[in-house]
Design a protein with these regions (language model features):
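Nucleotide-sugar donor-binding catalytic core of glycosyltransferases
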Residues: 1-17, 21-175
């Protein structure tokens, strides 16, 4: 059994009957919810979904229980990070795609007028975690208007003991 995250990013996937997709995209935009991606989800053994809004979207598109299961994401403090006070270099850190989002770029430029802001576009794993820990706050700026709350990102930061400042969301009543 294979559990696949970000399935839309891979050219080749494990066999449909042996894979479960952990769906982490937002249904408020068709950027990732293409017909090909919907086919990948539908053909898979199962889909794990963190957002009730996304579950409703999937159901309206014919993909529902028993093939879709709600699995909310939560923070889990790793002992490796507990009590690791790190010197703060940045007021804010933003990580994600700021290059193709004019909305995010404008927001970040305005923030940089008054604060020290570190922008990470293509950084992952331990390198990213080290920078997050050097920040007073992680800023969460939506790619889309009316976006869902980016719980995977928020829980990742909370697990690193760094607070997150986020815009409001269309699904904030879920949290």
């Amino acid at each position: 059994l294979y559990i696949v995250l970000c399935a839309q990013m891979f050219k080749h996937l494990p066999p449909a009957g042996k894979r479960v997709i952990f769906q982490l995209e937002q249904s408020v935009s068709s950027r990732w919810f293409t017909q090909n991606y919907m086919n990948i989800l539908t053909e898979s053994l199962g889909v794990l979904e963190y957002s009730l809004t996304n579950i409703d979207f999937l159901a309206k598109n014919g993909l529902k229980y028993p093939n879709v299961h709600y699995l909310p994401i939560g923070a889990s403090l790793d002992e490796e990070f507990e009590g690791n006070a790190t010197q703060k270099k940045y007021d804010f850190v933003f990580y994600g795609d700021s290059l193709s989002s004019e909305r995010r770029r404008r927001f970040l430029e305005k923030l940089q007028e008054k604060y020290s802001v570190k922008i990470c576009n293509d950084l992952f794993g331990d390198e990213l975690y080290a920078i997050i820990k050097e920040s007073r706050v992680v800023i969460n700026i939506h790619y889309y208007e009316g976006a869902l709350l980016e719980m995977p990102r928020i829980c990742e930061c909370i697990s690193l003991d760094v607070p997150v400042l986020s815009e409001g969301t269309s699904d904030q009543d879920e949290y």
